[in-house]
Amino acid sequence: MSSAAKKEAILRQFRQLTNATPQDANRILKAHGYRIEPATDAFFNNEQAQINASISSSTLDRKSEREVKERLNALFDRFRDAGADSDEEDDEASQPEDRDLISIGGALKMCEALEVSPEDVVFLPLSYYLKSASMGTFTREGYINGWKMLDLSDTIDKQKKTLEKLRQELLDNKPLRLERIAQEKSNPATASGANKGLYEKVYEYTYAFARREGQKSLALENALAFWDLVLPASPTFQRAGSQGTFTQAQLDLWKRFLSEQTRGRAVSKDTWMQFLDFTKEINSDFSNHDFDAAWPSIIDDFVLWVRDNMPASDGMDTS
C-alpha cells in the first residue's frame, strides 16, 4: 500500500472513531504523525473539534432539512393559531397578530400537547434552548432552531421524549448541547460562561426570563415563585440522587426573610446570581458563613436574621 493510500485509510478510520470533520481530521492526524491513538486523544481534548463534529453530524441533506423545518413550522403555526384564537376570546381589541410569535395562549396549548405543566421545571431549559425572551412567548426562529438542536425533535412524540432527557440533563448539570456552546462562545456577552453546565445556565437565564417587561430587577413575588421552582432541581439541593446539602427548610427561611424583612423590595441580579453560590457553601446551621467575603449585603443580613430567629435547639451555633 502506498503512503498516500495508507494515510487515506488512517483518515477514514479516524473519522469513523471520532466523526471529526475532514479539515479537523487531517489537521490532527498530521500533527500526530498519523498515529491513531494519540490523534484520537487529541481530538477528545479539543473542544472546538468536537463542536465542529457535532454540528457536521447534525447537518441534514437539503431535502431532509426542508422536511424537518416544514414539520416544525406546522407545529409552530398550530400553537400560534391556537394562541391567537385564545387571545381574541380574552381581548376583543387585541393587537394585530404577529405571524412569527407564539403568545401565552399558544404556549399553554403547546404544554397541553407535550403533556407538561407550564409550572414544571423542565419548561425552563426548554425555554432556554428555544430562546424564549419572556414567559410564554416563542419566536418562530427560536422554536425551529431550538427543536432542531434538541435531537431534531420535529414531532410531538419526539419532543416528549426529548423533554425527559432534558430534565435529566438539568438535574445532573450536564454540559450544554455542543451547538449551543458554539453559539454562546460566539457572543462576547456569554462567551466566558459557555462551559457552564445546563443547570447553571438555566438558573442565570431564569432571572431575565421571569422579569416583568421593562423592569430591570425581578419582582419579589416572581423571585420567590421561581426559586421554589428552580432551586429544588439544583445540584446543591438536598434530594434523592443528589450530593447537595441545601435544604427545603433553608429555602423556606430565605423566602420568609425576604417576605418579612425587605418590604417587598425587588431582587437584584447580583443577589439572584450569588444566592446559588451561597447554597453551595453554607452548612445546615449557617455557622460557616464568611461575613468578610464579597456576598451581597442582603445575604449577610439573612444569616444574621437566621441566627436571631432560629432556636438554639435547632443546632444553630450562635457564638
From Swiss-Prot:
Transmembrane segments: none
Example GO BP: protein neddylation
The keyword DNA-binding is annotated on this UniProt entry: no
GO cellular component annotations of the record: ubiquitin ligase complex
Gene Ontology MF terms: cullin family protein binding; ubiquitin conjugating enzyme binding; ubiquitin-like protein binding
Keyword match Acyltransferase: no
Protein name in UniProt: Defective in cullin neddylation protein 1
Function, in words: May contribute to neddylation of cullin components of SCF-type E3 ubiquitin ligase complexes. Neddylation of cullins play an essential role in the regulation of SCF-type complexes activity.
Domain DCUN1: from-to ranges: 67-307
Domain UBA-like intervals: 7-44
Keywords assigned by UniProt, alphabetized: Ubl conjugation pathway
Pfam family, one: UBA_4
Gene3D superfamilies associated with the record: Cullin, PONY binding domain (1.10.238.200), DNA helicase RuvA subunit, C-terminal domain (1.10.8.10), EF-hand (1.10.238.10)
Domain of life (superkingdom): Eukaryota
